[in-house]
Amino acid sequence: YLLSEESRVEQLKKSIPKLVKELGESKVTAGSEVKYYQGTEGLKQMIWNVVNQKDEFLGLGYQDWNATVGKNYADKLRQKMLDNKLRSREILNEVDDSFAFTDLGKGYSQVYEHRAIDPKILLINHDTYIYGDVFAYYYHYQGEYFGVEIHNKEIARTERQMFEVLWKIAK
């Protein structure tokens, strides 16, 4: 048995250089891009990117935008959504049906719809956004603020499908 395992390990060792070469030669799908954002200003830019497009965006929500970019900036973006009739659907662990988080009040519900999912099914501890051909992570916790946008049609499509499954489960 030991000789068999040693032989297998030797074969794996020999295959590593070939694998490394192949990985180095592989190309990112044409048009794919990854963007990294840091700090409050970076997250402001990310949210701007989310609301500065025409189609509905989807997401998982950890906290409302006020927590990271401030209520004034967040309400400007929410107003932009209303003005442009940009719809959004979000899944959260807890929902605020009073809309107390925004000065726009329940008028914001014209473009924003949310549902709750039990944290035992899915514990949400960061935000995600899906829009166009973009899937984005937005993280803020204990002073750490960063985000990543993945610009890739297939990844966005898959994430959108997973969101729709969760949307049906959420209430």
Q: Where does each model-flagged region fall?
A:
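Signature of lipid phosphatidyltransferase scaffolds
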Residues: 146-171
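Hydrophobic protein-protein interaction segments
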Residues: 38-151, 155
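Generic alpha-helical structural signal
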Residues: 3, 10, 17, 44, ...
